[in-house]
Amino acid sequence: MMAKVSKRMKEISAKINAEKKYPVSEAFDLLREVSSVKFVESVDVSVALGVDPRKSDQVVRGASVLPNGTGKTVRVAVFAKGPAADAAKEAGAEVVGMEDLADEVKKGNMDFDVVIASPDSMRVVGQLGQILGPKGLMPNPKIGTVTMDVAKAVRDAKAGQVRYRVDKAGIIHTTIGKVNFTSDALKQNLEQLLTDLKKAKPAVSKGIYLKKVSVSSTMGPGINVDFSDLNI
């Protein structure tokens, strides 16, 4: 098994020049070329930003609605009541509730990928921080998951919204689709993400902001992308 893996890695290394910045479409073609697993891999992106994440005013976080989605089915839970709860259900939320939903979360019943909350439900949701927080599910107004318009938030989540937060090294990691997407679809998704990241640039960030962009498949190596010709 190890021999097979190392042989595959040698073949991949021969095809990808780690020092080169590849045109976007060529990078996506390469991803498909080196993908040899039996499932449809996600296309992940890492963006190195010119920020110091140790400083609170340089923590970049937010959300981006990708025009071509992520290729994933997203299950949404919403904390809301009254008309807001009805609107969330109509928008396609799988689970909607208040104290009853909180009880399910406390029991560990969390068959959902995104949690959205109306502002008046935060008294209930606030008690679940230690459960939802470590799983990256805690609603937050900065990424649009605490909102008066829960229906729009549900639709955005279903349409392929990705959330991001800069890590300690100043890098954003997220997904922009699947390897079976067309190169144009992946390019449009990447352009949307980078456009939204530029809008989220902290005022105190100096010098080059978008420093490096690389793409990879789930099991594949990173490929550096020349993003200078993108529409961002």
Swiss-Prot record:
InterPro entries: Ribosom_uL1_bac-type, Ribosomal_uL1, Ribosomal_uL1-like, Ribosomal_uL1/biogenesis, Ribosomal_uL1_3-a/b-sand, Ribosomal_uL1_CS. Belongs to the universal ribosomal protein uL1 family. It holds the Pfam family Ribosomal_L1. Transmembrane segments: none annotated. GO terms for biological process: regulation of translation; translation. Binds directly to 23S rRNA. The L1 stalk is quite mobile in the ribosome, and is involved in E site tRNA release. One of its GO terms (molecular function) is tRNA binding. Part of the 50S ribosomal subunit. Keywords: Repressor, Ribonucleoprotein, Ribosomal protein, RNA-binding, rRNA-binding, Translation regulation, tRNA-binding. The gene is rplA. One of its GO terms (cellular component) is cytosolic large ribosomal subunit. This is Large ribosomal subunit protein uL1.
